[in-house]
A protein has these predicted regions:
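Rossmann-like adenosine-cofactor binding region
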Residues: 25-120
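Aromatic pocket-lining residues of Rossmann-like dinucleotide-binding sites
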Residues: 8, 12, 74
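Short glycine-rich hinge loops at helix-strand junctions in the catalytic core
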Residues: 16
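The conserved SAM/SAH-binding core of class I Rossmann-like methyltransferase domains
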Residues: 22
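Hydrophobic/small residue at the entry helix of a nucleotide-binding pocket
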Residues: 4
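C-terminal helix-to-coil terminal segments
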Residues: 114-176
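Hydrophobic "lid"/C-terminal helical patch
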Residues: 8, 49, 98, 148, ...
Length: 176
């Protein structure tokens, strides 16, 4: 369970939820006990959970981590929440499951083919779609502001900005 998963668990605990988790690496038993969380395999987590929050990086291993098979074992009242990376969910399969009302609903802040949306997703009344704002915490906004100022100062001092996205343009400009 990573940093984000632990933060979600703390919030879920405030609602007296039973917290199941699945992760590549199990946390220490002492930490599980302190956090009051239970490590289970993915299938058990999907079968037993009312709310499933995905908090994983996008890797070859996690691409389409949730697909047709995984969605089929979820409770008909379960809600799937994805604030991690869009391709973690096979959205075509999700649209089918939501349309057939085989799960309770979904909340998405990220999308498989961002900025495009999977056809049918916006026509569903059992999904909440957000414009990729899950990172909009005070902490991240402060870091974004700090990075912007650092980039401006570097540019004004004639240095290469630390977060330069397109260095080829800078090279072209200096050759003019």
């Amino acid at each position: 369970m990573g940093k984000i998963g632990k933060a979600v668990a703390v919030r879920a605990r405030a609602f007296d939820m039973r917290i199941l988790y699945h992760n590549r690496k199990r946390i220490a038993l002492k930490e599980e006990k302190t956090m009051r969380v239970e490590y289970v395999d993915l299938k058990t987590l999907l079968k037993e959970s009312d709310f499933i929050s995905l908090n994983v990086p996008l890797t070859e291993e996690t691409k389409h981590l949730i697909g047709r098979n995984e969605l089929s074992v979820m409770k008909p009242t379960a809600f799937l929440i994805n604030t991690s990376r869009g391709p973690v969910i096979d959205e075509k399969a999700l649209v089918e499951v939501l349309r057939a009302r085989k799960i309770g609903g979904a909340g998405l802040d990220v999308y498989e083919n961002e900025p495009s949306l999977t056809p049918g997703l916006t026509q569903l009344d059992n999904v909440i779609l957000l414009p990729h704002v899950g990172s909009g915490t005070l902490e991240t906004r402060m870091k974004i502001g700090t990075l912007a100022v650092e980039n401006l100062i570097a540019g004004l001092e004639g240095r290469i900005p630390p977060n330069l996205v397109n260095p080829e343009i800078l090279k072209m400009r200096s050759s003019l």
